[in-house]
Amino acid sequence: MADPAECSIKVMCRFRPLNEAEILRGDKFIPKFKGEETVVIGQGKPYVFDRVLPPNTTQEQVYNACAKQIVKDVLEGYNGTIFAYGQTSSGKTHTMEGKLHDPQLMGIIPRIAHDIFDHIYSMDENLEFHIKVSYFEIYLDKIRDLLDVSKTNLAVHEDKNRVPYVKGCTERFVSSPEEVMDVIDEGKANRHVAVTNMNEHSSRSHSIFLINIKQENVETEKKLSGKLYLVDLAGSEKVSKTGAEGAVLDEAKNINKSLSALGNVISALAEGTKTHVPYRDSKMTRILQDSLGGNCRTTIVICCSPSVFNEAETKSTLMFGQRAKTIKNTVSVNLELTAEEWKKKYEKEKEKNKALKSVLQHLEMELNRWRNGEAVPEDEQISAKDQKSLEPCDNTPIIDNITPVVDGISAEKEKYDEEITSLYRQLDDKDDEINQQSQLAEKLKQQMLDQDELLASTRRDYEKIQEELTRLQIENEAAKDEVKEVLQALEELAVNYDQKSQEVEDKTRANEQLTDELAQKTTTLTTTQRELSQLQELSNHQKKRATEILNLLLKDLGEIGGIIGTNDVKTLADVNGVIEEEFTMARLYISKMKSEVKSLVNRSKQLESAQMDSNRKMNASERELAACQLLISQHEAKIKSLTDYMQNMEQKRRQLEESQDSLSEELAKLRAQEKMHEVSFQDKEKEHLTRLQDAEEVKKALEQQMESHREAHQKQLSRLRDEIEEKQRIIDEIRDLNQKLQLEQERLSSDYNKLKIEDQEREVKLEKLLLLNDKREQAREDLKGLEETVSRELQTLHNLRKLFVQDLTTRVKKSVELDSDDGGGSAAQKQKISFLENNLEQLTKVHKQLVRDNADLRCELPKLEKRLRATAERVKALESALKEAKENAMRDRKRYQQEVDRIKEAVRAKNMARRAHSAQIAKPIRPGHYPASSPTAVHAVRGGGGGSSNSTHYQK
């Protein structure tokens, strides 16, 4: 470490403009600026700082005034600190961070990230840099890592030089401004902010961004290191103004407490008389211990509000800045000595120690002589000048055994120092233990949250299962009710069927009895008629008068009976004729509908088979067409690439010919000059033989040089040709890949359009099938109505049959009583019976035909439903295939983009490898840390206008 030097803390004062709330409130602008270093608040005293920045100061001007010099100092091996102090909503975060990615409004931290690398790019190429960054916040007086949110209570320890540091904080190695900005974005996203009455984005914690830079000269092995603390303090708050409550109020308490501890440290350092500085009252002051009164160049930016509403806080902030301006820091370069330098320093200290020992011996001898009462002459005494020249640089006494009191005090002081050291060590151990317990508590808390989430998800799943079980139970109950209803209906149908069967049997037996009785009566009637005719023949002559009267009576009765029978038959014939006509029409309609359904099914099967054949042919043709198109596109791409390659080669050939011509011209000039020299030297050949020999040697050297130039030119030409061939090969591969991907994309688009058209066709077919299903349902309903009509007509027939049987029984009885009038009535009754039996037989046939047709339609129904389900499944399969095709297209597009990015990275890396040499930024590889960009090599950034290249000579 170099010799220390004393410097003061720089204090910059920045006033923000009035915000909208203050303008609407009508607040007065109270600061008055006098020059660049003085500001007056109202009618009060002037406040003088290193620089006063008015509201119209740009972010770039703030950076140039506050931070630009510190960046240079850090790169020269010094420590640096920049932090913003002020009340809430005074512009601290805007000053330190601003808008991170806005070139005009970005603050000090992002500008430093770019400026550091700009300085490195302009430094010596023999320098190698290691840059690592950390980002943490102090929230509720606990150190929380913003790059690893699981570390919530980190401890502050001291290294071997008694410099505080945060133990266990995440460190990221960076090699470019973009990586630094990525770290800042990541940490900023994890920082605590809240909304108050004074600020919409109020910082609820102190954030510290630490940049650690180590540089090494690879030739001289000189090593320098510097740390840069960039601190964004949370603002002091008045609860009456911010309206904080709840958790925000607790945060405000801790913020004010830590800022009060910072004020106490500043006051103690400003007074300069206190032996104890309360660094340990707050973790923030403990971390900034080296920045306040230690080995660090520190700049404080005090941010103030210009509003009269915040006048008291503004004056308090200005007083804080004036106190801080009086603090002196002792800074020195953080230099790591080499072995040779340590050896020289050891020899120097050894010589100094030897001189001090000789002085000590002379003084002891002189003291003994004085004690023995001997007077020592002045020329033998050691003068004060000699003592001063031989004193060590520190003011420790040379003679430490003058009085035993000094030894006792030193021993007691060492004892106290050891005790303080042990207490500090115990405190650090307690901090470690608290940190471990906090991390364990956080892990347990996270596990509890995970268990709660798991329990909640289990509870949700249980509720879903319960709902599903309830729904299934309800459906089961409904199904049971339906089954019961169906069984009940079947039982009722069975009972009705048994009843109807019993009734039919009863009616059949009654009909048979009536038929037997009718046959008996007919036989009896025939016998009686025969006997009557015999009796009439026998008594014809005797009863002629009676016979004529009887014949007249029979004739009248026959006419009356015929008239009655004819009317009955005619009425019955009309009724039965209407029923038969309706049954015939229904039978014809059902048979016609059945034939149409069968023809439609056959037509649909034919169309499906034809469509499948056409689809197969079309798919085969499309595959052949796609293959041909791919082949044609590949050939066209190759032809185009070869044409471009030939053009490039022609241009390069012309360039080489031009260069060859220029070289030939130069060679001709040299030969002409050589000939001129030979002609000029021929006259003086004898006199200047020695000079000619020298000329021959020069000529040989020139020819050798030309030959070496020719060989170098040839090598360079071959190398350029190899590079051109390699680049052309890469370009051809990229073009071929691009052509293939474009063709694949076009093929996928065409497949998508085809699938879409097929989907539309399937929807049309599905609509047709649904329409056909509706027609079938309508036919089923019509058939049910027809069956009901047939049942009613059968019931009517049964009723008519009963009436007919009753009427027949009545007439038979009458015919028995009226023997003479039975002939005509018997014929009419037989005619009625035969007609009714024929109608009954026809109705039975029609009923059976309707039942058969209904059964056929019911058999066709499952087939049609199966085809409908198959069509729906086919539609779903087409939809899933379409979705899968879209996903494949997206994956191919992503893969193509990744391949293009990879090729771009490879080309960029090759281009960067040709850049000029400058200072390097090495990025070591650490076990357990995933790399941010390339995992294969260590990145090194080169300055002097260069880019980044790969450096594999240093890995950790």
Swiss-Prot record:
CDD domains: Khc_CBD_cc, KISc_KHC_KIF5
Reactions that this protein is recorded to catalyse: ATP + H2O = ADP + phosphate + H(+)
Disulfide bonds: none
Residues modified to Phosphothreonine: T403
All copies of domain Kinesin motor, residue ranges: 8-327
Region (Microtubule-binding): 174-315
Signal peptide per UniProt: none
Span list, region Disordered: 910-956
GO terms of biological process kind: anterograde axonal protein transport; anterograde dendritic transport of messenger ribonucleoprotein complex; intracellular mRNA localization; motor neuron axon guidance; mRNA transport
GO CC list: axon cytoplasm; axonal growth cone; ciliary rootlet; cytoplasm; dendrite cytoplasm; distal axon; GABA-ergic synapse; kinesin complex
Cell wall biogenesis/degradation listed as a keyword: no
Coiled-coil intervals, chain numbering: 406-923
Region ranges (Globular): 859-956
Keyword list, A-Z: ATP-binding, Cell projection, Coiled coil, Cytoplasm, Cytoskeleton, Hydrolase, Microtubule, Motor protein, Nucleotide-binding, Phosphoprotein, Transport
Gene3D superfamilies in the record: 6.10.250.1590, Kinesin motor domain
Function (record text): Microtubule-associated force-producing protein that may play a role in organelle transport. Has ATPase activity. Involved in synaptic transmission. Mediates dendritic trafficking of mRNAs. Required for anterograde axonal transportation of MAPK8IP3/JIP3 which is essential for MAPK8IP3/JIP3 function in axon elongation.
Description of its domains: Composed of three structural domains: a large globular N-terminal domain which is responsible for the motor activity of kinesin (it hydrolyzes ATP and binds microtubule), a central alpha-helical coiled coil domain that mediates the heavy chain dimerization; and a small globular C-terminal domain which interacts with other proteins (such as the kinesin light chains), vesicles and membranous organelles.
Family of the protein in this entry: Belongs to the TRAFAC class myosin-kinesin ATPase superfamily. Kinesin family. Kinesin subfamily.
Subunit field text: Oligomer composed of two heavy chains and two light chains. Interacts with GRIP1. Interacts with KLC3 and TRAK1. Interacts with ZFYVE27.
UniProt protein name: Kinesin heavy chain isoform 5C
Organism of provenance: Mus musculus (Mouse)
Highest classification ranks of the organism: Eukaryota, Metazoa, Chordata, Craniata, Vertebrata
